[in-house]
Regions:
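Metal-dependent polysaccharide deacetylase catalytic core of the NodB/CE4 family, i.e.
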Residues: 1-58, 92-93
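Active-site-adjacent pocket scaffolds in enzyme catalytic domains
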Residues: 1-12, 16-17, 62-115
Length: 115
């Protein structure tokens, strides 16, 4: 996401209550394309993994991102993922975030359940 990293009327890139579906899709597509352009203009390949701001995702966002060529998405739920040969298992993956100020050792102990 380029500009959907704040709480306010919208939580991350979730569709607002009562928001027109077409308007929402346009907003998410344009925001995502802005990021893609910035990255490719820097000579880097376009990302194929989308990381949801605040982990806030929906069926609408998953459908749109798949149509844009994304091969996986990451939420914020801290969990271990099971990856299979089914490409759909790569969507709404969990992840572990290491907060600023936490040592790598402490972080890994927590992530591995040794805390």
């Amino acid at each position: 996401s380029w500009n959907l990293h704040e709480y306010g009327e919208r939580r991350g890139c979730l569709r607002r209550r009562g928001e027109d579906e077409t308007r929402y899709e346009t907003l998410l597509r344009e925001d995502t394309e802005q990021t893609q352009t910035l990255i490719t203009d820097a000579g880097l390949p376009a990302p194929t993994c989308y990381t949801y701001p605040f982990g806030a995702c929906s069926k609408e966002s998953e459908t749109l991102l798949k149509s844009m060529g994304f091969r996986c998405t990451l939420g914020c739920e801290e969990r271990i993922n099971t990856v299979t040969r089914n490409p759909d298992c790569l969507f709404e993956l969990g992840r572990f975030n290491r907060p600023a100020g936490q040592s790598t050792e402490s972080y890994l102990h927590r992530a591995l359940g040794e805390d």
